[in-house]
């Protein structure tokens, strides 16, 4: 009776309901007109008008006591309002939860279950509402639609347990196994809306299909990262067979290729990558995965070409398309994770991968040019702040400079290498300590990086090698000596347990320090040899063996010098000790040194140590 008083009469009630429904339908049609417009101020204004119209309509409906006859429309308006808000925000956030909660509370108001509203949170409200929904079959289509939006919110916020329980209730399932979530989504059958139902921006079944694809992809990616490859393959196949827009399909195909590559099936992986790169747009993730696949297959030319295409793809500015005014798979995917195999990073990170792989594969001219391009990107500020490529761990910016100098020296461009070294030196020399410091103490300084001394030492080392290439022995020896002077100012101290920084490449700083000392001593020793000063060379080679025990390169250079000086007895004794060492694993062989240092050590390594040992065996004994 009170309801009739508020509405005037049953006739006026029906008239208001018709007006409200017509208003909802008009707003939905208006949104679909806006959807067909390109990105423009007119589209933006039209969509905003629809959003405000839905907000006002919802305010009118919820300003009256809840009634079963009006609730299907009210719940539909809530669904349209949430759908439009989420699509405009390009994602689901917790601030949508109050709209869902208010809709559930309105259902319970019709059953006079106020205590359920007060005592339960959102999960409890759903239990209560779905329990009474059997008494209100006319509400089921709208409730399932609202449940789909709740599922989207919980999927986006990783509340998978709540999502599982909700779907079990919707399906009438008794199982509580969380791993059945994919099956629960597949078996969920939202009721079909009647032909005279209020219009919706997106129906419940379409939303269910989006949820199924998004969850399958999220689960497959998670399983891929954790190493559950067969399960990942199954989940990703499910995602690929679902409602998958082209950008998402590219990611799914790339993830499938990654999974198959890790399972040792490169040819099948390649088929998915071919599908991923079809079409007009160039996508970064499949190109990065292609480079990994070709590297695994030993096809260096194809690997480098893939990285070149990746750099090109990341340099293109993509014009964003107008977002759909409905819930799409992209809205339910997690934000880009640097640890993900699908993360291809920035243009500078891709350029670094290309440059470093050229350096590692002896494509020295290409490496030099790519490093110079990379330095230009980093120095002109056109790129976001450079950070190491996530997989494998990449270098800090100073190490990029050092690798660039190494590449230039290897390409015979010593003068350019000196210029790069001078640029890096101007940026780091002010951070050097003014007095000798313990390595561990240097780490605790607030201004100086713990890697600063090795970086500057490496600059002097590379400058020395550049002068060697230019035939300036005096300058070369001077730079090697400056390198050693700085290195011996820093005293290694036992490193406490803890994770290595990205600059250390899984190698302790003390090992880098040790190898730098050996490299500088060997390099200066080789210059003494070139100048006919074998006695000075002997001192440096002997010291290099002492500072880096187990370094076979230093030992071979020392042995050759002893033989040239005709110190036969010492040479025989040392050769016997060295021959015994060759049967043992070389010390520090399991550590991965920074690329610039690995490359440098290759330069000063005797070309054929086994042949040298055999020569010593026949000549000394």
Which stretches of residues belong to each language-model region?
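Non-TPR docking regions that flank or precede TPR/alpha-solenoid scaffolds in eukaryotic proteins
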Residues: 1-621
